[in-house]
Amino acid sequence: MKKLKINYLFIGILALLLAVALWPSIPWFGKADNRIAAIQARGELRVSTIHTPLTYNEINGKPFGLDYELAKQFADYLGVKLKVTVRQNISQLFDDLDNGNADLLAAGLVYNSERVKNYQPGPTYYSVSQQLVYKVGQYRPRTLCNLTAEQLTVAPGHVVVNDLQTLKETKFPELSWKVDDKKGSAELMEDVIEGKLDYTIADSVAISLFQRVHPELAVALDITDEQPVTWFSPLDGDNTLSAALLDFFNEMNEDGTLARIEEKYLGHGDDFDYVDTRTFLRAVDAVLPQLKPLFEKYAEEIDWRLLAAIAYQESHWDAQATSPTGVRGMMMLTKNTAQSLGITDRTDAEQSISGGVRYLQDMMSKVPESVPENERIWFALAAYNMGYAHMLDARALTAKTKGNPDSWADVKQRLPLLSQKPYYSKLTYGYARGHEAYAYVENIRKYQISLVGYLQEKEKQATEAAMQLAQDYPAVSPTELGKEKFPFLSFLSQSSSNYLTHSPSLLFSRKGSEEKQN
């Protein structure tokens, strides 16, 4: 048999020609208009969003938020950096897609028939309803029939405009509204509570989070049923970005990452309590300033605001608090626990906070390493409340009922079962008030959300006041001091004592740049 002589040069040339011929059909690479190829060639995923407590926010200069976290993971999935552009309202977001300034919109946007005519939706990941809001103490409308443009204002590009138009044509011909081209939904809700506006419309999740900081905002009525939330990208013949998004969300769903992120941002519950929230925020103003140094001093592995939320749940920041079961002090420690921690006076606020932190750290150290880092605190808090042994039972019960014992979202749903005989009778450590542990952790999360948002709001107000002061009394050179056109500064320069100096860092704050590199 004649041996074949292989012409490697010919094979190489043939393979090169074949690759060139097939290159345009390769889904993620190739032609210039392939979106994934363009993103990877650029080395960054451009995402436009809006600034809300849920979608995108910052604490101490560090970005966070449901949509931000998902977008960051998607950028990592593609092997590129994330570039976030923050816009003022929804209309500006879609302008970014239209003008080619964004690859994706990740901003809690609702899927609807009008939007999908012009833009490509991605997978849906939670749902909301649109609700009419008003200020507590003002007139609550029970229907839209008589609302006028002087009363009702909505944000530009808001999905509810289509619903309002349909309602006007089919049910309420007298209905009218105004669109404010300069404000987003959060700013309009602020206008409502400040008495500048009677009503606006926002989605149910945004309202729930807003109420944690502004409990005087109330829901008048639902405008729509539940609507799915999704991301949007340009609509054209290129489906590579859509395919990558689908693969990404499927992978996140299968490995439980999506459920964990949603639990982190949406798992605080929607059972808003006006009186409780208002009472808490009043305590933030009246009591927290005296306790803040202690929380900051002893908070080590956790944020001091979370520690403050724990202490409020325990005692409402009352160092003398005592329960019928004998627990006492700011962190409501038992006598035995206090003795084991070397605490001599449970009613001493500093001793109690220090001891409570050490006890919580002990619980944290016992949580299995398999539990994700950002969920360990919730397991530890449940153990802090009902005992670590019962937390082990809750994890075991979760595994037996086909849940994930390392997922707080799964375990917390089983906590109430620990007080039901058909379940606790089969567990190692028996009966526990699991429903109380569930409520305990959920309340702490709500207080933390309220505290973080409220302090941010206070900081924003202080910054705005300082900026206004800077505008009213602009900086001048020392040689100008004393001249009549600056009488206020002249007064300051002539004061021999107790004079006021304004550091530029106090007068001016860095404005949030629209584009943030992450």
Swiss-Prot record:
Signal sequence, renumbered to the chain: 1-21
Membrane topology, record value: Peripheral membrane protein
GO terms, molecular function: peptidoglycan lytic transglycosylase activity
The keyword Transcription is assigned to this record: no
Residue ranges of the region described as Non-LT domain:
22-269
Q: Where in the cell is it found?
A: Cell outer membrane
Annotated Gene Ontology cellular components are: cell outer membrane
Keyword vocabulary terms for this entry? Cell outer membrane, Cell wall biogenesis/degradation, Lyase, Membrane, Signal
Q: Which reaction does it catalyse?
A: Exolytic cleavage of the (1->4)-beta-glycosidic linkage between N-acetylmuramic acid (MurNAc) and N-acetylglucosamine (GlcNAc) residues in peptidoglycan, from either the reducing or the non-reducing ends of the peptidoglycan chains, with concomitant formation of a 1,6-anhydrobond in the MurNAc residue
Q: Enumerate the active-site residues.
A: E314
Task: Work out whether the entry's keyword set contains Cell wall biogenesis/degradation.
Answer: yes
Question: EC number(s) on record?
Answer: 4.2.2.n1
| GO BP term, example | cell wall organization
Record PROSITE patterns: TRANSGLYCOSYLASE (PS00922)
Region (LT domain) residue spans: 270-518
Similarity comment text for this entry: In the N-terminal section; belongs to the bacterial solute-binding protein 3 family.
Question: PANTHER family per the record?
Answer: MEMBRANE-BOUND LYTIC MUREIN TRANSGLYCOSYLASE F (PTHR35936:SF32)
Q: Which NCBIfam families match?
A: PRK10859.1 (NF008112)
Question: What does the UniProt record say this protein does?
Answer: Murein-degrading enzyme that degrades murein glycan strands and insoluble, high-molecular weight murein sacculi, with the concomitant formation of a 1,6-anhydromuramoyl product. Lytic transglycosylases (LTs) play an integral role in the metabolism of the peptidoglycan (PG) sacculus. Their lytic action creates space within the PG sacculus to allow for its expansion as well as for the insertion of various structures such as secretion systems and flagella.
Q: What is known of its domains?
A: The N-terminal domain does not have lytic activity and probably modulates enzymatic activity. The C-terminal domain is the catalytic active domain.
Q: What is this protein called?
A: Membrane-bound lytic murein transglycosylase F
Protein's organism: Shigella boydii serotype 18 (strain CDC 3083-94 / BS512)
Q: Which gene encodes it?
A: mltF
